[in-house]
């Protein structure tokens, strides 16, 4: 799955072939087709695994009583951790979003809905507690998921710009970026 994720991230769904995946993974093409029923099955399995991992962490989070601001910080941490564990996922999802979800298996839509519902629930809790100002949950979802996905997907370009001296900074620590997003959201949502 690692080789396929790298190729889907780099070339997109359409630009990736089972032959290329087999070569990169050093496996027989027939094995991929047998285990995943082809390229689309493998693509779906990757996304199902990663969405499932995130949803399991969010379900654990819901069991703990905590304020909405802490819950939102944990949501950001879960997705930051996911993008660090699965480096190609960010680019895969951005490509999928740009294609209008053309290659997204319909069985994955409930996973995406549950991720959005987690944000919606956090926003509603924060407004009810009086700790968050009233914001659109869909905007909040795109703010959180979008900035994390872009940060991790843009790493190759960012690294190139740093190595070529275009940007004068050291490589950016993902944990610092996640903390930065958490702080921005906490301050930006705080009820005045």
Feature map (PLM): residue ranges:
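Helix-turn-helix
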Residues: 3, 7-41, 45-46
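C-terminal peripheral helix-coil segments that are non-catalytic and often amphipathic
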Residues: 78-81, 85, 113-133, 147-192
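Amphipathic alpha-helical segments used for helix-helix packing
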Residues: 71, 84-106, 155-163
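Short, basic, alpha-helical segments at the C-terminal edge of helix-turn-helix-like DNA-binding modules
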Residues: 48-53
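All-alpha amphipathic helical-bundle segments outside canonical DNA-binding/catalytic cores
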Residues: 70, 106-111, 127-143
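Short coil/turn segments at alpha/beta junctions that flank glycine-rich nucleotide-binding fingerprints
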Residues: 10-14, 65, 86, 129
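Hydrophobic alpha-helical connector segments
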Residues: 59-91, 137-144, 175-178
């Amino acid at each position: 799955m690692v080789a396929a994720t790298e190729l889907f991230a780099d070339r997109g769904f359409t630009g990736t072939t089972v032959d290329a995946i087999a070569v990169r993974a050093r496996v027989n093409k027939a094995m991929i087709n047998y285990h995943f029923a082809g390229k689309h099955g493998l693509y779906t399995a990757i996304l199902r695994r990663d969405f499932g991992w995130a949803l399991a962490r969010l379900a654990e989070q819901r069991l703990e009583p905590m304020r909405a601001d802490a819950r939102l910080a944990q949501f950001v941490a879960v997705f930051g951790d996911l993008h660090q564990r699965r480096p190609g996922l960010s680019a895969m999802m951005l490509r999928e979003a740009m294609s209008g979800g053309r290659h997204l298996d319909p069985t994955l839509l409930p996973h995406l809905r549950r991720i959005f519902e987690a944000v919606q629930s956090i926003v509603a809790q924060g407004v009810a507690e009086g700790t968050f100002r009233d914001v659109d949950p869909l905007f909040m979802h795109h703010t959180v998921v979008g900035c994390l996905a872009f940060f991790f997907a843009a790493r190759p370009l960012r690294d190139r710009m740093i190595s070529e001296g275009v940007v004068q900074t050291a490589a950016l620590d993902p944990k610092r970026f996640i903390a930065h997003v958490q702080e921005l959201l906490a301050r930006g949502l705080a009820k005045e």
